């Protein structure tokens, strides 16, 4: 056993334990107090903490001939280093672990909508400028020889044929594909697990709430989420506009992850989560709430159609049941949080947040127009 190897190396653990049990050695103490099934790796880690080792001992790989070591355990032994690097230990005060994520959620949501308001202001200014620039460009194009069959021209034609919503989510899809490719780089596995999966038991709590929204490990998971996002992109951008949609989408990713944190802390079912499902549930719920009579169909089963309102009710019911019953295949708390945020925003949030952005826009306008002038100096 690994514990036996530690005792023979003479690191002082045997003496520390022997004095408290009347001279019994570590091996005798372990045999008396510990059932055989607890002499595995987890128990060794517990003993290590109690003995106060400053340096983790070298891990001893189980041999094939060791009794009590199954073939499955031997195959998994090669995974011990990366698994140990990603073991999550819940805080002894789990409620405290939600304080930083709560402040991050509120702060990020405010920054997202504030940035979106400024973005919209800048977009309106650039559109006015581009209108006059376009008149000049059209005149130059009329006298400039045109290139036929140019690849760039074909790309521009394809891009211009997309709707505003499709052009908006193209960047989101590209970011998800990039992160999916990064998961395939072995040297980045620890970084990806640390920053691109959300877990309230992790040491890094805040940044994964946003980054995990763009993270997918499974190709099918990513393809399904991006298909739904692409399908609803035109509708949601027509309802909210490009800038407001981006603020809602990014905020939804953080909010749904915070609800997931709350659910995991409340139930004690800790584990990493990733994916854009929470943010996409916000998009789906917002569209279904705004257009409840719209007709939807299931992919690969287009003959079965149903109203958007009924689809939303079914999804909420399923995620509520999954959260209560402890289904582990999906992060139902994140799905439910995203759906409720989408319903709330199109019902109340648009009036409370977006329509009250004017004071911020005026401040930004003052900064832009009354900034420091060039060529100053004393008179």
Swiss-Prot record:
Effect the entry attributes to changing residue 69 to D: Strongly reduces the beta cleavage
Phosphothreonine modification, residue list: 69
Enzyme Commission code(s) on record: 3.4.21.105
UniProt keywords, alphabetically: Hydrolase, Membrane, Mitochondrion, Mitochondrion inner membrane, Nucleus, Phosphoprotein, Protease, Serine protease, Transit peptide, Transmembrane, Transmembrane helix
InterPro entries per the UniProt record, alphabetical: Peptidase_S54_rhomboid_dom (IPR022764), Rhomboid-like_sf (IPR035952), Rhomboid_protease_S54 (IPR050925)
Catalytic residues, chain numbering: 277 (nucleophile), 335
Residues spanning the membrane: 102-121, 168-187, 208-230, 245-262, 273-289, 296-318, 333-354
Membrane topology qualifier: Multi-pass membrane protein
An example Gene Ontology CC term for this record: mitochondrial inner membrane
Keyword Transit peptide set for record: yes
Catalytic activity: Cleaves type-1 transmembrane domains using a catalytic dyad composed of serine and histidine that are contributed by different transmembrane domains
Modification after translation: P-beta is proteolytically processed (beta-cleavage) in a PARL-dependent manner. The cleavage is inhibited when residues Ser-65, Thr-69 and Ser-70 are all phosphorylated.
Annotated disulfide bonds: none
GO molecular function, one term: serine-type endopeptidase activity
Phosphoserine: residues bearing it: 65, 70
Subunit structure: Interacts with PSEN1 and PSEN2. Binds OPA1.
Described function: Required for the control of apoptosis during postnatal growth. Essential for proteolytic processing of an antiapoptotic form of OPA1 which prevents the release of mitochondrial cytochrome c in response to intrinsic apoptotic signals. Required for the maturation of PINK1 into its 52kDa mature form after its cleavage by mitochondrial-processing peptidase (MPP). Promotes cleavage of serine/threonine-protein phosphatase PGAM5 in damaged mitochondria in response to loss of mitochondrial membrane potential.
Name the record gives this protein: Presenilin-associated rhomboid-like protein, mitochondrial
Lineage: Eukaryota, Metazoa, Chordata, Craniata, Vertebrata
């Amino acid at each position: 056993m690994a514990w036996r190897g530690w005792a023979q190396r003479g690191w002082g653990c045997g003496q520390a334990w022997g004095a408290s049990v009347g001279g019994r050695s570590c091996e005798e103490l372990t045999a008396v107090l510990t059932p055989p099934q607890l002499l595995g790796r987890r128990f060794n880690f517990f003993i290590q903490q109690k003995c106060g080792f400053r340096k983790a001992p070298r891990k001893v790989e189980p041999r094939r001939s060791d009794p009590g070591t199954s073939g499955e355990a031997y195959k998994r032994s090669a995974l011990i280093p990366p698994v140990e690097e990603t073991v999550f230990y819940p805080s002894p005060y789990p409620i405290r672990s939600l304080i930083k994520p709560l402040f991050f959620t509120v702060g990020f949501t405010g920054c997202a909508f504030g940035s979106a308001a400024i973005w919209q202001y800048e977009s309106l200014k650039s559109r006015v400028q581009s209108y006059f620039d376009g008149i000049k460009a059209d005149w130059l194009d009329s006298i400039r020889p045109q290139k036929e069959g140019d690849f760039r021209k074909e790309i521009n034609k394809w891009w211009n044929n997309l709707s505003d919503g499709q052009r908006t989510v193209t960047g989101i899809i590209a970011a998800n594909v990039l992160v999916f490719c990064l998961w395939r780089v072995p040297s980045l596995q620890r970084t990806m697990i640390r920053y691109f999966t959300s877990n309230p038991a992790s040491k890094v709590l805040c940044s994964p709430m946003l980054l995990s929204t763009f993270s997918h490990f499974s190709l099918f998971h990513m393809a399904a989420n991006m298909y739904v996002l692409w399908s609803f992109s035109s509708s949601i951008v027509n309802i909210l506009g490009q800038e407001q949609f981006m603020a809602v989408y990014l905020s939804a990713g953080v909010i749904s992850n915070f609800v997931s944190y709350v659910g995991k802390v409340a139930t004690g079912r800790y584990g990493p989560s990733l994916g854009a499902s929470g943010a996409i549930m916000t998009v789906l719920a917002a569209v279904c709430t705004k257009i409840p009579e719209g007709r939807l169909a299931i992919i690969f089963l287009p003959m079965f159609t149903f109203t958007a309102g009924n689809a939303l009710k079914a999804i909420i019911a399923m995620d509520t049941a999954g959260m209560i019953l402890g289904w582990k295949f999906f992060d139902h708390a994140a799905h439910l949080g995203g759906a409720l945020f989408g319903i709330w925003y199109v019902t109340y949030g648009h009036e409370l947040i977006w329509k009250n952005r004017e004071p911020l826009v005026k401040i930004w306008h003052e900064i832009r127009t009354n900034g420091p002038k060039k060529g100053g100096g004393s008179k």
